[in-house]
Amino acid sequence: MISYSVMDNIKVLKKGIDISKIKAQLDQYPSDWGSQKGLDNAEIKDPHQYITSVDILQLVMGGITKKGEDVGNTEICIPTPAYEHHTEVLKYLGEQFSDIRRCGFLALPVDEIVGAHIDEGTYYLDKDRYHLSIQGQYKYIVGNEDVIVDAGTLLWFNNKMPHGTVNLGDETR
């Protein structure tokens, strides 16, 4: 892949990706948002501890073997019921990457942020993280670097550094 950036912690890999089929499937299955809640052998972070305005649609999420286990410390990956509905994003990602592990969509409302955080747990120690922007415009920040991201952009970021985002657009990103 060609990198469009000269930063160390954020690499814009592709711009101008046609995401129309991915977006169409998101629009076709609006009830998939949040559908991962309550799955057996899966863990959702405590909403009282991890307060966010982000809506989540997990396609493949982390799993656990026993109650109370930290999902960040397991290699278990569980396809959710929504997985079968979102073939276009899986097709695109499969063309770009040889192995897709945990995968989901995040919807961030206008003017909202995801504060700086580091992905916690042993799962993330040897995993790379990527974002494929589906709609809107946002600023992605990693350490002291930032980039403005538009729909149709694929980027890699260093999830071992503090990272976060702010929605700059006039629609949910």
Task: Report the location of each language-model feature.
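A short beta-strand-loop-beta hairpin characteristic of the jelly-roll/cupin
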Residues: 115, 130-151
